[in-house]
């Protein structure tokens, strides 16, 4: 049987709730095109790192991060209402670079395939 840490279960709940809060409660246009990709909660449940990407963008705009930080207090308050935890974790927002990295890898693989096709057609 697989053992799950409580922090992992809380992280899943926090991810779901923050995604819902961003979708339904935040009206700031700077954060309207965000997707929450992951949440890491510390073992003591006091800190949560929220990873996000901007739809259609390879990198995060500074205005987006600023908008999230401004809305952080409101998001934390909403989490406190929705989750039954003794402590609501402090929220740290971080852009998720894994999508940009994956996009770059995909681009390199496509370039290699194009070069192989060009080399094969020359002979």
UniProtKB/Swiss-Prot annotation:
Return the SUPFAM superfamilies for the record: Ribosome-binding factor A, RbfA
Q: Name one GO biological process term.
A: maturation of SSU-rRNA
Q: Single GO cellular component annotation? A: cytosol
Q: Where in the cell is it found?
A: Cytoplasm
| Major subcellular location class | cytoplasm
What are this entry's molecular-function GO terms?
ribosomal small subunit binding
Q: Which UniProt keywords apply?
A: Cytoplasm, Ribosome biogenesis
* Family annotation (Gene3D superfamilies): 3.30.300.20
What job does the chain carry out?
One of several proteins that assist in the late maturation steps of the functional core of the 30S ribosomal subunit. Associates with free 30S ribosomal subunits (but not with 30S subunits that are part of 70S ribosomes or polysomes). Required for efficient processing of 16S rRNA. May interact with the 5'-terminal helix region of 16S rRNA.
Under the subunit heading, UniProt states: Monomer. Binds 30S ribosomal subunits, but not 50S ribosomal subunits or 70S ribosomes.
> Which family does the similarity line name?
Belongs to the RbfA family.
Q: Enumerate the PANTHER family for this protein.
A: RIBOSOME-BINDING FACTOR A, CHLOROPLASTIC-RELATED
Full protein name: Ribosome-binding factor A
Task: Give the organism the record lists.
Answer: Syntrophus aciditrophicus (strain SB)
Tell me the classification of the organism that encodes this protein: Bacteria, Pseudomonadati, Thermodesulfobacteriota, Syntrophia, Syntrophales
């Amino acid at each position: 049987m697989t053992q799950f840490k409580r922090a992992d279960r809380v992280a899943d709940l926090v991810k779901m709730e923050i995604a819902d809060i961003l979708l339904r409660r935040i009206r700031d246009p700077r954060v309207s095109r965000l997707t929450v990709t992951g949440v890491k909660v510390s073992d003591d449940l006091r800190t949560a790192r929220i990873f996000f990407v901007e739809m259609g963008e390879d990198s995060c705009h500074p205005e987006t991060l600023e908008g999230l930080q401004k809305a952080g207090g409101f998001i934390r308050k909403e989490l406190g209402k929705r989750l039954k935890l003794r402590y609501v974790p402090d929220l740290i927002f971080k852009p998720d670079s894994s999508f940009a990295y994956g996009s770059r890898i995909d681009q390199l693989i496509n370039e290699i395939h194009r070069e192989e096709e060009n080399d094969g057609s020359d002979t």
